[in-house]
Structures are given as C-alpha cells and as structure tokens.
C-alpha cells in the first residue's frame, strides 16, 4: 500500500475539515477498501462546476481503490434540504426528482469511473421506515440540538418559521450513512451538521462512526455567492465548450486562484509557480486560458478545448478586447438597454437599440439583436462598437437563500 502519510496528504488537498483526521488514519491503516459516500438531492437537472469540487474528491478515493457510492436522494429530494436556507425549501414532486436523477447519472460519469461507481437511491430504505421507524429515528435528536445549526438558529432568532420536516431532513441524511455502513462521507461546508448527524446515528446503531470530510463551496461567476443555478452564476458540466471557455474567461483574476485550488488537477507547486509568474508580470488572461482549457478537456476533450481557445482568440483578441475594462455590479431584473446605459457603454437606451440594430452590441462576443430583453444574470463582457467594453455582474435579488 502507498505510504499513509502520502495518501493522507493527497486526500487533504482542498478540504476544509476532516472530522476526524485521526479516525481517517485509523481506517486507512486497516488496509481495506473504504465505503465512501457522497449524496445529492436531484433538485435541478444540471450538475455544475460547484458540484464537481466534492465529486473530484470522490474520484480521488476511487482512484486509490476505495468503494465509492453516489447516493441520489430521491426520497430526501421530496423533503427539501434546509441547509443554508433562510426559508422553507419547496419540496419537489416524485416526477421531477426521477427526471433529474436520470440526468445526474449521465453527468457524474464525466468525472467518476462508471465501472467502479455504485449508484444508490435512498428511497430504497427510507421509504420502508414507516411511522414507527421515523419516530424512533427522531428520538435520537432534540430540538435544542437541531437549533445549534446556524441556519436554524438564525431563522428561530428572526422569528422565521421552521417546519417540522426540516428537522427531520438531517436525520434522514444521517440514516443513509447507517444504511450504507459508510466509512467516509463527503459534502460541502454547508453540509457539516448533516454529516455529523450521520456519525451520531451510526454510533447509536452500534457502528463505527464515519469520517466527515467537508470541502469549500465554489464561488460562482459573480465572485460573491456560491455557484448556484438559481442565481445564474454557474457553469454546467454539459455546456458547450465555447460557452464554458467564455464564462471562465469572464471571472475576476482573484477568483481565478480559488478556482485553480478547488477545480484544477495541477500539482500545487505548479499552481504556485503560475501565481508567481502573474505577480512578476505575466498576463493573468494567459493563466485563465490554461484553466479554461483544462476544464473543457475534462468534460469534453482536448480537441474541443483547443477549438474553444481558437474561437475565443478569433472572437475577442483579434477584435482588440482589452486586458482591462470597467467593472460594474447591479442587482435585480434589468433590461439590456438599461444595463448598457448604466455601464456607460451608450448615452441612452435609444442609442443601445440603434447600436444593436446595426450589429454593434455583443455579449461575450456574440451579437445581440434585441436589447429590449432582460440582461442575463451572472458576469458577462458587454461590448458596444469596436472599442467600448465593460464587465458587468448582474446579481439575482435573493428571496430564498
């Protein structure tokens, strides 16, 4: 077996917490394939780069010879995960959950080895719990302990409603670990409480508690909030190569390094070298291109990555896109013509309409004919004429976080 310290260093890369590291070392010393679990409720049909942070860690365990379980929460998806929310999350219908689950299976194989990945659905055991089983499960935790969760604590303090089924959700996710006899569970930092519930329920069931490994949440294209389809600040793993390339190139230079740390498979010393080169005068755009190509090659292929780079060069650099440009941040619904005016690209909305009719308005290099539509959410590069550019981040106004 590979030296445990070497394996541990590899597994720790990019993690936020390992609870506990001592337990993980003990399990690794047993020199057996560990059961490593990652669960996801199929609340939307697309998997985006934010999801791949934990999927990449699951892949790492897989490459080290461990058993990986991708758990699709078809049962819990109909309950609704309250993690990080400031209001009750609406549950999905059975039909929505199953439809989204099918697309999940296809997309995770862009990262995981289909021959070595076990896909399980938690309805297999949760639907059999029944009323008596659910009551026994609920008896393992108190309301006081549930209110230790930051999101519940904030909502309770703000007199915002918390539905009973939201207290049940962490117990259901924790019971998944009991049913699978998981050795390790992965999740984002917002899942820490749920992962620790799994440890406690395993102890109550007389099993060895799982190791909980949390990973940072990937900040989305807006540079502020976690990547989320509902916020429009995401890149889906099935998006066209040219779209992926353009979106990666739109992120800020500061955010680029966070993405390198969480998404790139490059050795850490290589990333440090790239950062040093930028600090010494290398154009960060060139380093961003390397990241864009790495991600496109992973989710498509190298040929697609090279083609996307060439298209970007033809579209932007030959069009004299500047390395630096004004940056703006707006929130809420905004008409494209208004956005162009507010960003200083046109003196009036009527001028925006006229410029578009003459083919002079572009978003990420693509011509836009109708500026009467709403501007897209997220971060995009807007161009009017040959020399006016602005990078604009349009945030969605949150109602449910």
From Swiss-Prot:
Q: Does the keyword Protein biosynthesis apply?
A: yes
One BP term from GO: tyrosyl-tRNA aminoacylation
Any Pfam family matching the protein: S4
Q: Which UniProt keywords apply?
A: Aminoacyl-tRNA synthetase, ATP-binding, Cytoplasm, Ligase, Nucleotide-binding, Protein biosynthesis, RNA-binding
Write out the GO cellular component annotations: cytosol
Write down the InterPro entries for this protein, in alphabetical order. Answer: aa-tRNA-synth_I_CS (IPR001412), aa-tRNA-synth_Ic (IPR002305), Rossmann-like_a/b/a_fold (IPR014729), S4_RNA-bd (IPR002942), S4_RNA-bd_sf (IPR036986), Tyr-tRNA-ligase (IPR002307), Tyr-tRNA-ligase_bac-type (IPR024088), Tyr-tRNA-ligase_bac_2 (IPR024108)
Reaction(s) catalysed by this chain's protein: tRNA(Tyr) + L-tyrosine + ATP = L-tyrosyl-tRNA(Tyr) + AMP + diphosphate + H(+)
Job of this protein: Catalyzes the attachment of tyrosine to tRNA(Tyr) in a two-step reaction: tyrosine is first activated by ATP to form Tyr-AMP and then transferred to the acceptor end of tRNA(Tyr).
PANTHER family (UniProt xref): TYROSINE--TRNA LIGASE (PTHR11766:SF1), TYROSYL-TRNA SYNTHETASE (PTHR11766)
Protein name (database record): Tyrosine--tRNA ligase
Q: Which organism is it from?
A: Haemophilus influenzae (strain ATCC 51907 / DSM 11121 / KW20 / Rd)
């Amino acid at each position: 077996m590979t030296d445990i310290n070497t394996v541990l260093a590899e597994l720790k890369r990019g993690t936020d917490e390992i609870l506990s590291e001592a337990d993980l070392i003990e399990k690794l010393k047993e020199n057996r394939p560990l059961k490593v679990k990652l669960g996801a409720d199929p609340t939307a049909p697309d998997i985006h780069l934010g999801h791949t942070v934990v999927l990449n860690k699951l892949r790492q365990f897989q490459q080290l010879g461990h058993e990986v379980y991708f758990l699709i929460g078809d049962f819990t998806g109909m309950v609704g995960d309250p993690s990080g929310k400031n209001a009750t999350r609406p549950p999905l219908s059975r039909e929505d959950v199953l439809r989204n689950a099918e697309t999940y299976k296809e997309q995770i194989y862009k990262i995981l080895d289909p021959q070595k990945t076990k896909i399980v659905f938690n309805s297999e055991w949760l639907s059999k719990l029944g009323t008596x089983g659910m009551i026994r499960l609920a008896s393992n935790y108190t309301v006081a302990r549930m209110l230790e969760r930051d999101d519940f604590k904030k909502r309770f303090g703000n007199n915002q409603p918390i539905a009973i089924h939201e207290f049940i959700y962490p117990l259901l996710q924790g019971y998944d670990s009991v049913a699978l006899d998981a050795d390790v569970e992965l999740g984002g930092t917002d899942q820490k409480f749920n992962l620790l519930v799994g440890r406690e329920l395993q102890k109550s069931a007389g099993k060895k508690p799982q190791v909980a490994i949390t990973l940072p949440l990937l900040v989305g294209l807006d540079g502020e909030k976690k990547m989320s389809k509902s916020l429009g600040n995401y890149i889906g793993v099935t998006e066209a190569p040219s779209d992926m390339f353009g979106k990666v190139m739109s992120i800020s230079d500061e955010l680029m390094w966070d993405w390198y740390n969480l998404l790139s498979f490059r050795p850490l010393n290589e990333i440090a070298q790239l950062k040093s080169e930028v600090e010494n005068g290398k154009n960060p755009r060139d380093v961003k291109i390397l990241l864009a190509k790495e991600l496109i090659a992973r989710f498509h292929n190298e040929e697609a990555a090279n083609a996307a780079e060439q298209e970007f060069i033809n579209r932007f650099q030959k069009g004299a896109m500047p390395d630096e440009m004004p940056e703006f941040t707006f929130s809420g619904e905004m008409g494209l013509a208004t956005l162009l005016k507010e960003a200083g690209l046109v003196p009036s909305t009527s001028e925006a309409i006229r410029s578009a009719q003459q083919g002079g308005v572009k978003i990420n290099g693509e011509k836009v004919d109708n500026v009467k539509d709403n501007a897209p959410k997220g971060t995009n590069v807007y161009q009017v004429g040959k020399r006016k550019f602005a990078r604009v981040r349009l945030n969605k106004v949150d109602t449910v976080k």
